[in-house]
Amino acid sequence: MVWRQAKWDEPLIFELNNSGANRQGLLINKDDEIRSEIKEMKIPKNLLRENGPNLPSLSELEVVRHFIRLSQMNFGVDVGIMPLGSCTMKYNPKIEEKATAITESHHPLEDEDHVQGILEMIYELQNWFSEITGMDECSLQVPAGSAGEFAGVLMIKKYHEDHNRNYKDTMLVADTAHGTNPASAAMAGYKVMYVKSNGEGLVDMDILREIVNDKTAGFMLTNPNTLGLFEENILEISKIIHSANAILYYDGANLNGVLGIARPGDMGFDIVHLNLHKTFAVPHGGGGPGAGAICAKGELVNYLPYPMVEKVNGKYRLSKIPKNSVGKIATFYGNVGNLARSFAYLLGLGPQGVQMVGKMSTLATNYLIAKLRDIKELELIAPNRHRKHEVVFSVKQLMENYGVSANDVAKALLDSGFYAPTIYFPPIIEEALMIEPTETESKETLDMFAEALKKIVEDAKRNPEQLLKSPSNTSIARLDQAYANHPSTITPTYRVLKLRRMGKINYLK
């Protein structure tokens, strides 16, 4: 596949019109009927701006072309495969954009009787996510997966406090865990202790038995883990954790690999957080805000964030407050627009479709492994084990023998028209390439990706110096990362840029 990205010398939108010409569009006067109804709005003087907003004076056409050009220098799943491991960058059907539009004309403070349809949707999602995860109840109040994770850790802390177990001050975290796991635990005031993996990439059971004690508050784990391996000892892990009156916490980042096939609740987990922007078709990052869910079973449902939707006398009400709730994690009721996306996604799939997601994502990963298995420079921990949603290769041999790193391989993939996989994660794998193809990619796409990776390995052995110059087909080549991130040069906003140009900022603190 021949691919070359567009390259525009595109200025910032604030700097597009340097002539100073006024290209402002049509100003529409207030409607007379509205004016007579509300009169003039009386805004306190201390809230009024001293000067008008510093907006560029541009025509509609200039604005459209500006953003189209920027989009041509970007890359997303609508352009090609994005195999970012542990990110689940699946294609999100466009029909779901229509679903989220139903929330745009409503306000979170609107009367509940006016938004019965939205509340019914949230109510159904609460039940669906509880069923999918094997939990008893679910709260959608959290605005994102990481916020749901933090809420889950707060639930563990409050639960132990209510049971006079303040001595439980340590949270166990798998060494393959996402960075948010130890971060959430530390934010909640816990000491963090890592549980090492064994030679097969699974939780080392001997180490786990040795370190679990009365001070253990919980164990944060993904299953499948971040190597794409299913923790086959999960039931025994559950027994060990519960024997210490600790909580088994499920990070839902990797749920896609077992979706509709295995449920965390049946594995012995007590609390689950979900990333709707991974598993349930909500766009990532620049595509829009994330969305989360936090689910629990048994006594722990009493600690879920509020409010939750319940059905009272045939009406849906945001009135359910668990008796020991950790409270609100954010204002209002989560990212409702994104909940609508997930609702449409699940409604379209149905139970059998949900199960196919887990099966096809697993099939895609293992097909890719089969295509790449004979390349000795792509090392695989526990090579005879099947993977679930993702796989981690090590290119340590390329680095040792030819000076080609995981970063270099990722840059070379960009030149082939593929987004780079996650690199250097998890940190227990040297020179890691973490690949998650997802269920939405075709066999043909996986074949092309595998061939591109094979060619890069051969190029690394034949002409490593040339490979180190990649990428050359992208809009921007390699960045000087130290320069870009140094406090004396990092420029995150236009305001900072202007202050730098005026010499008013030297270092960002």
UniProtKB/Swiss-Prot annotation:
Known NCBIfam families for this protein? Answer: PRK04366.1
Per its database record, what is this protein's job? The glycine cleavage system catalyzes the degradation of glycine. The P protein binds the alpha-amino group of glycine through its pyridoxal phosphate cofactor; CO(2) is released and the remaining methylamine moiety is then transferred to the lipoamide cofactor of the H protein.
Q: What is this protein called?
A: Probable glycine dehydrogenase (decarboxylating) subunit 2
* InterPro entries for the chain: GcvPB, GDC-P_C, GDC-P_N, GDC_P, PyrdxlP-dep_Trfase, PyrdxlP-dep_Trfase_major, PyrdxlP-dep_Trfase_small
Gene Ontology molecular-function annotations: glycine binding; glycine dehydrogenase (decarboxylating) activity; pyridoxal phosphate binding
Q: Which organism is it from?
A: Saccharolobus islandicus (strain L.S.2.15 / Lassen #1)
What GO biological process terms are annotated to this protein in UniProt? glycine decarboxylation via glycine cleavage system
UniProt keywords (A-Z) are: Oxidoreductase, Pyridoxal phosphate
What are the record's GO terms for cellular component?
Answer: cytosol; glycine cleavage complex
Cofactor field: pyridoxal 5'-phosphate
Q: Which family does it belong to?
A: Belongs to the GcvP family. C-terminal subunit subfamily.
Catalytic activity reported: N(6)-[(R)-lipoyl]-L-lysyl-[glycine-cleavage complex H protein] + glycine + H(+) = N(6)-[(R)-S(8)-aminomethyldihydrolipoyl]-L-lysyl-[glycine-cleavage complex H protein] + CO2
Modified residues annotated as N6-(pyridoxal phosphate)lysine in this record: K278
HAMAP family in alphabetical order = GcvPB (MF_00713)
What are its E.C. numbers? Answer: 1.4.4.2
Record text on subunit structure and interactions: The glycine cleavage system is composed of four proteins: P, T, L and H. In this organism, the P 'protein' is a heterodimer of two subunits.
